[in-house]
């Protein structure tokens, strides 16, 4: 008998519809790191235990900088999640990634400036300093399931890899920044993937993201610079693809034995912690 799977789902802009979960119950969770963005909704998708959390709150009232990423991830861990699937709206930095396309990212570049990126900050709950390695940045096996599920569903415009630049926000990039990110080899830009992906790894959770390209940011010379109205319209038009992918991937994830993967992840975390020593 393998490890029992329980999947946390962090919904970004447009994907905070709790109706995708059956037999839903709301849980208020307070963590050592504060209160999560919203109540957590527990239930089942395709018979698999899941927990849904709206990253920005159900009323989208929390800007990216102010999201309590630590509380969100720790709350999912507290409720017994083994995996975290997230959706995120992104700007495309590549001609071949069109608005409405989906990317399953495999790497990131951090351009945030105001966010705590570790649980090991000197608190009494977790002792030491954690130098977590971020290669691979995302759970490879979980990504593989998402990619295979998208292929089986015949979802158009799916890209199997990509590097996401996470900026502080809430402002969008300048044209100079957007072109710099392109020179760095990045494919997408967003505001929420970091520190979420880092904290999930520290917590020993199998984390993968579904990134929806909603615009071309502002690097192109053809005048279609990013704006809120276009972002929301594109995400709303295409969010059913993200929902369909998540709903169909969940039972495939649950059908696999994750014991070794989770044990290896726990080992990585444990061997990354430097404990204080006495002189």
Curated annotation (Swiss-Prot):
Entry EC no(s): 2.4.2.28
Subcellular location: Cytoplasm; Nucleus
Domain of life: Eukaryota
Binding site for substrate: 191, 215-217
Record-listed phosphate binding positions: 13, 55-56, 88-89, 192
The keyword Cytoplasm belongs to this UniProt entry's keyword annotation: yes
Entry's Gene Ontology cellular component terms: cytosol; nucleus
Main location: cytoplasm
Biological process, per Gene Ontology: L-methionine salvage from methylthioadenosine; purine ribonucleoside salvage
Pfam family, one: PNP_UDP_1
Subunit field text: Homotrimer.
PANTHER family named among the record's database cross-references: S-METHYL-5'-THIOADENOSINE PHOSPHORYLASE (PTHR42679:SF2)
NCBIfam families (alphabetical): MTAP
Function (record text): Catalyzes the reversible phosphorylation of S-methyl-5'-thioadenosine (MTA) to adenine and 5-methylthioribose-1-phosphate. Involved in the breakdown of MTA, a major by-product of polyamine biosynthesis. Responsible for the first step in the methionine salvage pathway after MTA has been generated from S-adenosylmethionine. Has broad substrate specificity with 6-aminopurine nucleosides as preferred substrates.
Protein name: S-methyl-5'-thioadenosine phosphorylase
Species in which this protein is naturally found: Anopheles darlingi (Mosquito)
